[in-house]
Regions:
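Positively charged n-region of N-terminal signal peptides that target proteins for export
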Residues: 1-6
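Hydrophobic membrane-insertion alpha-helices, especially the h-region
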Residues: 9-24
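Short pre-active-site segment immediately N-terminal to redox-active cysteine/selenocysteine motifs
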Residues: 35-38
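Typically the conserved alpha-helix immediately C-terminal to a functionally engaged Cys/Sec
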Residues: 42-57
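Extracytoplasmic/secreted envelope proteins and their assembly/folding machinery
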Residues: 46-49, 72, 76-79, 109
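Thiol-based oxidoreductase modules, predominantly thioredoxin-like and allied folds used
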Residues: 57-74
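Short, structured active-site "lid" loops
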Residues: 77-99
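Non-catalytic, surface beta->alpha helical segment in thiol-disulfide oxidoreductase systems
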Residues: 91-115
Length: 115
């Protein structure tokens, strides 16, 4: 009997908890900069970001792909989602801003300049 009495309260509380968890999971930056640790074009982007304090202006994750297989797989999936041809692999740097993919140091630097 007590279970029936408290069920709506427990159910409602559970729904609120689930909503908070979902919102917390979606709070992080959606933008991602994929790079390789020995990539010279990636170094150009990194130098620009450091000189212009880009990380203070734009929230994004940096994911290294040469030494991290799961990051490399995410890079490939992201490129596919952007409609890029991945049959010959995907080059870095690649910046995904949540909507589109920008590939190559100059396109990424130009995007950062506009922000």
């Amino acid at each position: 009997m007590k279970i029936k009495k408290y069920f709506p309260l427990i159910f409602g509380f559970s729904i609120v908890i689930i909503i908070f968890v979902i919102l917390a999971m979606n709070k992080g930056p959606k933008a991602i900069l994929f790079y390789g640790d020995t990539c010279p074009h990636c170094k150009n982007v990194d130098e620009f970001m450091n000189a212009n304090k880009t990380r203070e202006k734009i929230a994004f994750k940096k994911l290294e792909v040469y030494n991290n297989q799961s990051n490399a797989q995410l890079l490939t999936q992201t490129a596919k989602n952007c409609g890029l041809d991945t049959s010959a692999g995907v080059g870095v740097p690649l910046f995904y801003n949540g909507d589109t993919c920008l590939m190559g140091d100059q396109d990424i630097i130009n995007y950062f300049k506009q922000q």
